[in-house]
């Protein structure tokens, strides 16, 4: 069935962590993890977190406890207070404020062919952050777990987004970066899904994946043929 609507995750899909804000407590200790190490930890944590969520119940934010615990162990500073502060910073939408060049332009192009929406596990303020970053007006609907009261992968947040825009699940495609949260959550309500896999955590999983919005445009062009 033809795709009418595209929905996007925000963190690590449309917006990315501002390292200066996110890693402030490490920088205060004169610890500056490399981007290569952060990508490696992200890949490893996603694979571990997916396995955990598929066998138990866990919320999306539990990912960051695992991520920073692993990172701090790798850095040789396994401090619980530092870990808690780092995790808390991921739960503040304003710290997700880095945007890739060309994001608005790609969204505007996609918006000429599809209806666009957002589904994000956030703190009720994600619409303000998207506006601050200059892309809120690209979306017809913005669904925030802090407002809905349910986090991905719970079906209710996906269903709320579909209802808010009046679109059918089978005519919608969702793009997000965590398999167990975004892929399993969206497909459980009948949506199609493409993983936004900048860290290459799912390169060997055999699922639809892209590493940029431009990749998504190309993939959709192929699907529409």
Features from the language model and the residues they span:
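N-terminal helical cap/lid subdomain that shapes the substrate entry/recognition surface
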Residues: 2-104, 108
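Asp-based, Mg2+/Mn2+-dependent phosphohydrolase catalytic module
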Residues: 1-10, 36, 79-82, 104, ...
